[in-house]
Amino acid sequence: MSLKGSKTEENLKEAFAGESPANRRYLYFAQKADIEGYNDVAAVFRSTAEGETGHAHGHLEYLEEVGDPGTGMPIGETKANLASAVQGETHEYTDMYPGMAKTAREEGFEEIADWFETLAKAEKSHAGKFQKTLESIS
């Protein structure tokens, strides 16, 4: 039985999409708790973030047979993972962040538009690093 095209594939992608930002949010919340002096609370957030990472990795293990949920490219072997990373980062710096910056600027959010443009530059750098690394092992 193939996972490709199934409702279960959709569910795994949805679950992965939920777990990944939860990890980042909890790490951010931990940082805030540290600043406010709640070290024990920060530890709870960090521990839970690590659990969310484990959940996301579990979803990816099942999704390996159908491809990267972000790019649709094959995942599993390092060369394929690097190629997928290049594609994902390239999308972010060529389409995603420029489009978001344009929208933010049109809506009058200049500082946020500048932030998105800064991120586009960072993503371009990431894509270049991944591409260089891929070429070095090919």
Indicate where each model-derived feature is located.
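Non-heme di-metal
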Residues: 1-138
